[in-house]
């Protein structure tokens, strides 16, 4: 887990980028070149920036994007198979993954059956040049399907002005290795108007957990062309293919943990149900966009991005026995296309911003019982569905420059989501046989409708208002009040005969926050206080009404509130100290705690950057939290069933660069990286094996998520 924001950055006015609300943030290091990242003086919300220096030097070369996001206050995630070796989810402000927007160069990407994200198949460290983390719904111009939990914008790599080729080789714990080739053309063309960079890499690892093997191949390319002094074209494309043996059930047994066995997951014995050959993924993904930024004249700017990304998760996994139906043949796939069009206009009053986000996702999913020895599927699926999600979000906002010190930005966004479903008849796992008869003996369906179609539309008006006031040239304060929303999961119609009425409403959140930012060449400080009311989940009624309809019942509100602060201090002689902390409460109206939400987090990091050395020793502590359980009777969760103690993770990165080690080499950098330096094995998640299991009454079969052991990576990069 990374635990320090990476290096101080401040916005600089760049005319072609000012319209790009979610895209590239121009950055400049402070004169000391040692201070960690900081909030921006012009910010209107709680925002942290992580820079390329952090990603290149203080993140494992096999890491995914969650290690970059973890660098910011309050953010955390765990990968029980090791850093970069699993599908890791980030939590921030007590909200788990699926409650926030993650974007790449301003383009939101997410799963289509819920707003979740897959870190192991999109945007590894090789593709990332930093991130901007906004822990708020943002302004009206902030787009996405779950803005209330924040917007985390990953940035692509900056292109080099000079020609360069980088060769990287890395070896590490658990037979982990990575090789990478990266080439920068530098500026080329008659007037140096073109620039291109590409990266190709392969990562292999046995993983910390037994037989949880990972094999990842990735490619990315970025091209920029200055068409004129007022117009710039940017194109990006990436492809990844992940193959592994990760099972559907990823935890270890409590009985193993009690014996000091922290990584027993899969077996090499084909007579056992957890044989690794019965559990495997093949997940190819791609992500591409073409964007143009141009000055239209009379103060108008325009940016347009056309994008496409796809995800094809073919997973096969076994259950707890070996039979002709104990395994599952699973597919989760989607292709998303969209367009983000933005305009802005400067005037004496300030800046007008308006635009439209259009997004269409075509999805196909199924799960079918299968024989793990032959992978022959039964006839009737657990479910099989196709659906199209169409999103439209037009917005308008105006940043009023009241005077040289005060800016006020009101805005409004209209969010429209339409989903069109076609469910095939199934064995009762979702919509049932649709009037037919299902035979459990033969796993077939006789008669009934082949499929059923449904459609649902969700809409919301999402206003926002924010203000920034400069108390002094180096001291600002801000306030914001904003709405955010999230559409329900696609399981809305996963009831008998797909008859659901009424359907759930979108989750609506209202967020208020105030904050302040102070900075100098030697010190930066940022702090904020926030309060959020969030609509709680909906639960399906246990029985249908007289018309056969199942209702979705509102379960009440959730209230999140807290304070956050971060600061960095240049100590001199290349040393700097970074600290951050969060303190909050995350509770339902009933007063019970939200699962997975720590009461507090703290980070302390000591950095040394001088001459050929770049080092970072960071400690991050995640406070105690709760996990829910399953009751002996009924279907609702048991809140606060399991209490998890505080977790502290220490990481160390040491980089040493040798300039011109030989006539052909520009420089060679050697990096030693250690994650979980003190080899902690704390429990970070619990899933009860039997109903009624709690911290007070644990079951030895409970499944535990445990910190992976210490991992060490030695990496060498040579530039030619």
Per-segment meaning from a language model:
Residues 232, 283-316, 321-441, 468-470, ...:
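Face-selective signature of the C-terminal outer-membrane beta-barrel domain
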Residues 49, 89-137:
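Periplasmic plug
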Residues 404, 530-543, 551-632, 715-719:
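Gram-negative outer-membrane beta-barrel transporters
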Residues 47, 57, 63-108:
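Extracytoplasmic beta-strand/coil segments of soluble accessory domains associated
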Residues 530, 535, 624-628, 656-720:
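C-terminal beta-signal and adjacent terminal beta-strands/loops
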Residues 292-295, 301-317, 470, 476-484, ...:
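Membrane-embedded beta-barrel scaffold of Gram-negative outer-membrane proteins
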Residues 27, 122-168:
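A beta-strand signature from Gram-negative outer-membrane beta-barrel systems
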Residues 164-166, 170-248, 280-295, 348, ...:
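Transmembrane beta-barrel wall of Gram-negative outer-membrane proteins
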């Amino acid at each position: 887990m990374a635990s320090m924001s990476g290096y101080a950055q401040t916005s600089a006015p760049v005319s072609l980028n000012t319209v790009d609300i979610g895209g590239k943030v121009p950055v400049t290091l402070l004169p000391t070149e040692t201070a960690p990242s900081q909030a921006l003086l012009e910010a209107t919300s709680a925002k942290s920036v992580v820079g390329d220096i952090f990603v290149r030097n203080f993140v494992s070369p096999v890491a995914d994007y969650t290690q970059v996001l973890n660098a910011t206050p309050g953010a955390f995630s765990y990968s029980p198979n090791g850093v970069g070796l699993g599908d890791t989810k980030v939590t921030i402000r007590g909200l788990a993954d699926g409650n926030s927007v993650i974007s790449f160069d301003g383009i939101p990407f997410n799963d289509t059956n819920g707003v979740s994200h897959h870190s192991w198949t999109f945007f590894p460290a090789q593709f990332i040049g930093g991130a901007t983390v906004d822990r708020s719904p943002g302004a009206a111009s902030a787009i996405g399907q779950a803005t209330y939990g924040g917007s985390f914008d990953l940035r692509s790599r900056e292109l080099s002005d000079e020609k360069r080729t980088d060769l990287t080789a890395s070896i590490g714990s658990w037979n982990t290795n990575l090789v990478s080739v990266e080439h920068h053309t530098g500026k080329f063309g008659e007037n140096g108007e073109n620039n291109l960079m590409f990266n190709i890499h392969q990562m292999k690892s046995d993983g910390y957990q037994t037989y949880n093997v990972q094999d990842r191949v990735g490619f990315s390319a970025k091209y920029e062309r200055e068409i004129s002094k007022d117009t710039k074209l940017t194109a990006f494309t990436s492809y990844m293919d992940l193959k592994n043996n990760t099972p559907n059930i990823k935890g270890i047994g409590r009985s193993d943990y009690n014996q000091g066995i922290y990584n027993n997951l899969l077996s090499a014995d084909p007579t056992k149900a957890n044989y690794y050959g019965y559990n495997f993924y093949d997940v190819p993904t791609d992500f591409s966009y073409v964007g143009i930024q141009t000055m239209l004249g009379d103060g108008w700017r325009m940016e347009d991005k056309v994008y496409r990304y796809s995800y094809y998760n073919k997973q096969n996994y076994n259950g707890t026995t070996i039979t002709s139906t104990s395994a599952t043949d699973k597919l989760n796939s989607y292709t998303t296309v969209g367009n983000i069009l933005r305009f802005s206009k400067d005037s004496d009053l300030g800046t007008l911003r308006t635009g439209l986000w259009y997004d269409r996702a075509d999805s196909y999913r199924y799960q079918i019982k299968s024989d793990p020895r032959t992978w022959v599927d039964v006839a009737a699926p657990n479910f099989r569905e196709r659906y199209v999600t169409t999103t439209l979000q037009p917005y308008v906002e105006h940043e009023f420059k009241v005077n040289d010190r005060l800016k006020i930005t009101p805005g409004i966004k209209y969010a429209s989501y339409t989903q069109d479903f076609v469910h095939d008849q199934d064995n009762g796992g979702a919509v049932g046989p649709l009037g037919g008869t299902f035979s459990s003996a033969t796993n077939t369906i006789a008669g009934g409708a082949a499929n059923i179609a449904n459609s649902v539309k969700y809409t919301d008006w999402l206003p926002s208002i924010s203000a920034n006031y400069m108390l002094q040239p180096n001291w600002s304060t801000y306030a914001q009040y904003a709405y955010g929303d999230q559409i329900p999961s696609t399981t809305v119609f996963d009831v008998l005969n797909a008859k659901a009425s009424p359907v759930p409403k979108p989750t609506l959140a209202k967020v208020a926050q105030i904050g302040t930012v102070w900075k100098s060449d030697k010190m930066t400080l940022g702090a904020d206080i926030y309060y959020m009311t969030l609509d709680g989940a909906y639960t399906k009624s246990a029985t249908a009404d007289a018309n056969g309809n199942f209702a979705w019942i509102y379960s009440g509100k959730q209230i999140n509130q807290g304070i956050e602060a971060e600061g960095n201090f240049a100590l001199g002689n290349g040393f700097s100290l970074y600290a951050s902390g969060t303190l909050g409460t995350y509770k339902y109206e009933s007063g019970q705690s939200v699962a997975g939400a720590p009461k507090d987090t703290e980070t302390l990091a000591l950095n040394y950057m001088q001459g050929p050395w770049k080092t970072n020793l960071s400690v991050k502590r995640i406070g105690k939290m709760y996990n829910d359980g399953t009751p002996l009777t009924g279907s609702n969760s048991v809140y606060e069933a399991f209490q998890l103690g505080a977790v502290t993770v220490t990481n160390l990165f040491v980089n040493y660069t040798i300039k011109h080690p030989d006539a052909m080499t520009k420089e060679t950098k050697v990096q030693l990286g250690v994650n979980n330096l003190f080899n902690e094995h704390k429990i970070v998640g619990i899933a009860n094996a039997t109903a009624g299991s709690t911290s007070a009454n644990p079951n030895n079969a409970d499944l535990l998520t445990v910190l992976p052991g210490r991992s060490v990576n030695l990496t060498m990069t040579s530039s030619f």
